[in-house]
């Protein structure tokens, strides 16, 4: 009879303890084996066994994970699976619940790839700081690839269509097999050392991980990272990733895309050149028009400031001044002539002849000779007095005695005092036999 002091478990309790023990002891395991008893019910989950020659274990891969498998599971296929051990408590069966599964050969390569990638990344081989930009204009390109593969045909076709002037050297190499990595590395190092190329393109078409394994070589990755010439890697399809992609300065998803990255489209270049020419022509016309306008303004200013222009201006001013002077002189002369005529008329009105005739008539009327003689003498004396009085006030008499009538040349006004004058005034002096023009040097009063 059982000892009642020991713990008594139910089947569910025992299975729970066993499940906890399994899950705690085996958090994550990798198993390589063959598939057996593969079933996929309507739920989308995948059930099978992993087996070898001596044992097997039940496995489950639920729909969220099984949907992403890259192969079709089938009987006898050797796989590499990763999962957690657990126990299905309802039946007491222990099983492996998988979250990843791949074909066995590719899985080993994948693990080696991930380990090498992590190590090179830790060393800084893939650091973005050391990557070089592609040159703006690629003139000479080296293409390391198989000379008979689809990749080289795609690259050359795109280059010929987009930019046929590019110089392209095909450096033929194996792209698959044991010696491919060493050959690609050697060609890369020689092309880089030559200094002949602006860019080096390493490329091949798609394939399995094993087919592309040459591009996961450590020596090749380090050679790409150390190259002084920018390196473009275009290996496989868009979903394929290799260490050469990580090490290269630029990674292209396909060979065709790599060719498009390296050269511009000649049609786009022609269009850009034409647009640039049009802008340059407009700029030239605008600049030339502004320059011509500026030159015209300078020419006008130069002509305005030239000695000939200034001489013409002085000549015009001199002619204007001469016309003005002649007009003023004519005006002054006319005024003087009018004054002389008025003076002459006054003299004539007091002429002795005019007074003598009436006197003679009066004398003839008066027969007495003596009385007539006295009266004649008296009248003659009176007449002479009148003549002297007229001559004393006559301007002509004043001028005849050596004096001059002085007027301003500017307006013809008569100068009556030295105080009216300033240095530099231009005057006209009317003399008995003509006139002279004088300039005031100094003036004194008193």
Swiss-Prot record:
It catalyses: Exonucleolytic cleavage in either 5'- to 3'- or 3'- to 5'-direction to yield nucleoside 5'-phosphates. Keywords: Cytoplasm, Exonuclease, Hydrolase, Nuclease. The keyword Nuclease applies. GO terms for cellular component: cytoplasm; exodeoxyribonuclease VII complex. InterPro entries: Exonuc_VII_L, Exonuc_VII_lsu_C, OB-fold_nuc-bd_dom. Pfam families: Exonuc_VII_L, tRNA_anti_2. Its main location: cytoplasm. Its EC number is 3.1.11.6. One of its GO terms (molecular function) is exodeoxyribonuclease VII activity. It is an enzyme of class 3 (hydrolase). GO terms for biological process: DNA catabolic process. It comes from the Bacteria. It is found in: Cytoplasm. HAMAP family: Exonuc_7_L. Heterooligomer composed of large and small subunits. Bidirectionally degrades single-stranded DNA into large acid-insoluble oligonucleotides, which are then degraded further into small acid-soluble oligonucleotides. Belongs to the XseA family. This is Exodeoxyribonuclease 7 large subunit. The lineage of its organism: Bacteria, Pseudomonadati, Pseudomonadota, Gammaproteobacteria, Lysobacterales.
């Amino acid at each position: 009879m059982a000892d009642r002091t020991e713990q008594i478990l139910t089947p569910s309790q025992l299975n729970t303890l066993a499940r906890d023990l399994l899950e705690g002891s085996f958090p994550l395991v990798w198993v390589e084996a063959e598939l057996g008893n593969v079933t996929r019910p309507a739920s989308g989950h995948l059930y099978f066994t992993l087996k070898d020659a001596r044992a097997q274990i039940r496995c489950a891969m639920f729909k969220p994970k099984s949907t992403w498998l890259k192969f079709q599971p089938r009987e006898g296929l050797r796989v590499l699976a990763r999962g957690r051990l657990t126990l299905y408590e309802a039946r007491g069966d222990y099983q492996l619940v998988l979250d990843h599964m791949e074909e066995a050969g590719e899985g080993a390569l994948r693990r080696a790839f991930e380990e090498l990638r992590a190590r090179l990344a830790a060393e800084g081989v893939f650091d973005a700081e050391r990557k070089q930009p592609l040159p703006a204009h690629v003139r000479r390109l080296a293409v390391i690839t198989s000379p008979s593969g689809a990749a080289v045909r795609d690259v050359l076709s795109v280059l010929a269509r987009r930019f046929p002037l590019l110089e392209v050297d095909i450096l033929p190499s194996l792209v698959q097999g044991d010696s491919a990595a060493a050959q690609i590395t050697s060609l890369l190092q020689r092309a880089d050392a030559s200094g002949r190329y602006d860019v080096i393109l390493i490329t091949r078409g798609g394939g399995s991980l094993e087919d592309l394994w040459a591009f996961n070589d450590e020596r090749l990755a380090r050679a790409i990272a150390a190259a002084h010439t920018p390196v473009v890697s275009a290996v496989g399809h868009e979903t394929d990733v290799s260490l050469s992609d990580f090490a290269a300065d630029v990674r292209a998803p396909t060979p065709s895309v790599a060719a498009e990255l390296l050269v511009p489209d000649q049609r786009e270049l022609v269009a850009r050149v034409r647009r640039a020419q049009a802008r340059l022509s407009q700029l030239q016309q605008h600049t030339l028009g502004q320059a011509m306008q500026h030159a015209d303004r300078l020419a006008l200013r130069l002509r305005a400031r030239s000695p000939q222009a200034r001489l013409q201006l002085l000549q015009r001013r001199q002619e204007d001044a001469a016309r003005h002077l002649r007009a003023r002189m004519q005006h002054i002369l006319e005024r003087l002539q009018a004054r002389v005529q008025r003076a002459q008329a006054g003299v004539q009105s007091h002429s002795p002849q005019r007074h003598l005739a009436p006197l003679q008539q009066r004398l003839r009327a008066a027969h007495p000779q003596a009385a007539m003689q006295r009266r004649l003498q008296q009248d003659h004396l009176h007449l002479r007095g009148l003549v002297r009085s007229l001559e004393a006030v006559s301007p002509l008499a004043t001028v005849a005695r050596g004096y001059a009538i002085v007027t301003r040349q500017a307006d013809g006004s008569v100068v009556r005092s030295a105080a009216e004058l300033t240095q530099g005034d231009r005057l006209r002096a009317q003399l008995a036999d003509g006139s002279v023009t004088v300039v005031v040097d100094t003036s004194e009063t008193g």
